[in-house]
């Protein structure tokens, strides 16, 4: 009982302490003395209630103490238990009475709380109303203050204006006084009245005349104004009519103007597109020009490389025995699909490089470059003359070749022997290439088919290599520019020249034949001046070269430098180039122990006289 009453009392005190903090926490309280008084009354009431609770607890403890004392005094347990039960019943009755009293106190406290809450709400509303009123009054006071300041400023300005007006009026007054004094002096010194009246009459007459003239002018001005007003009305009518006509014209021509604007925009776009396409075309033309120059340089370089490699490998062709080909004099070979294999084999042969690249150049290569320089000089001087006398040039070429080859029969010096082991090609690559070449030649010799014209092949350059597309043939090629130029490409057209069997051939410039000087009584002149080296050029551009005498070694170093700067002639074979090539190669290889002169003479005897096409690159 004591614990429950103590807990209830503590909770009630905590609630009472928390409740008064509400109204005092509101800002802007208007009655601090009333709040302090209420708080003091509440604290007094709390202390009174606490004292009552302590008294009740004290009374309960005293009763419990008396009960325990009586229980200790009673000898019988039944009586003690009965007394204890009675005490408990009494305590229950007391607790019930206490509970009823506490309920009444709770109801009273609830009513007091409701009253206090209503009062608090009223106070809050009053505070809000007062706050709004205070704000409104502050605003009104601020506005009044601003108006007061404005009025003060206006009063100051008015005061300044008043002072300025006073000064101005004083000055005017002084001026008026001075005028009055001056008029008084004038009146005192004025003439008689009769003179003044006469002058006034004359002035009156003059003024009347002026008034009449002014009236006439006024009437004329009125008439002019009326006339101008009529003209103005007429002009306004005309302007309205013109405005209506202009509006009508605008409405009529709006569609046409829009159409013309659209056409103008389209034309402008087309012009811009044409300008862009022109810029692209000019850029493409510049690129094509650069590519053309690059291709020309590449072609010159490749022609020089192929010429040098062909001259270097011609010695290998002469010294290597190939006894597999024995074609007849007039056999016609096929130009079919095996041409690609033949071209690939020749490319493999020309791609063979010397093993010892660090060694100096051999003597045959230097002499081949010297022979190329002589061929260039001859080709620059001889074309016009050979076109006029084709048969004579051909006979001279055949006769000189036979005589020079016959004279050089006893002088056997091979280029590979002069070069020595310093300039040895790659044997494995050459053997593979010769194997492929032999297979291709066997297949071509075994069949007798008519030459089929091949479609033109396109040559494209990429970097420092040449890519050949399509199947080319050994007919006479010719470079030309197509109507639709390919980007970075060279188009090659293939033309077939019909060969006549009556001995008439295409005129071609004669090849220079360096004679062999062996001391056996050869004729002097152009054939006998340099008889150490013989050069035979066949239809497909492979030249069989023999070494010159050692007397020209002093000029080799000078002519090696000139060979790199001069343009190389490109010898393009005719339609029957492959058959002539292989027959000459087989004839030169079947010579056996005979000298180079006999090999070349047999080669010229077996090969028919055909035309050679030269193109200066």
Curated annotation (Swiss-Prot):
Signal peptide positions on this chain: none
Record lipid sites (N-myristoyl glycine): 427
Region (Linker 12): 178-194
Chain positions of site Interaction with MIP: 450
Marked site positions, Cleavage: 34-35
Keywords of the record: Acetylation, Cell membrane, Coiled coil, Cytoplasm, Cytoskeleton, Eye lens protein, Intermediate filament, Lipoprotein, Membrane, Myristate, Phosphoprotein, Repeat
Cellular component, GO annotation: cell cortex; cytoplasm; intermediate filament; plasma membrane
Membrane topology: Peripheral membrane protein
Region (Tail): 314-617
Ranges where the IF rod domain occurs: 33-313
Region spans: Disordered: 381-429, 499-617
GO molecular function: structural constituent of eye lens
InterPro entries in the record: BFSP1, IF_rod_dom
Chain intervals for the UniProt region annotation (Head): 1-33
Functional summary from the UniProt entry: Required for the correct formation of lens intermediate filaments as part of a complex composed of BFSP1, BFSP2 and CRYAA. Involved in altering the calcium regulation of MIP water permeability.
Protein family according to the UniProt entry: Belongs to the intermediate filament family.
Subunit structure: Part of a complex required for lens intermediate filament formation composed of BFSP1, BFSP2 and CRYAA. Identified in a complex that contains VIM, EZR, AHNAK, BFSP1, BFSP2, ANK2, PLEC, PRX and spectrin. Found in a complex composed of PPL (via C-terminal linker domain), BFSP1 and BFSP2 in the retinal lens. Within the complex interacts with BFSP2. Interacts (via C-terminus) with MIP (via C-terminus) in aged lens fiber cells.
Name recorded for this polypeptide: Filensin
Gene source species: Rattus norvegicus
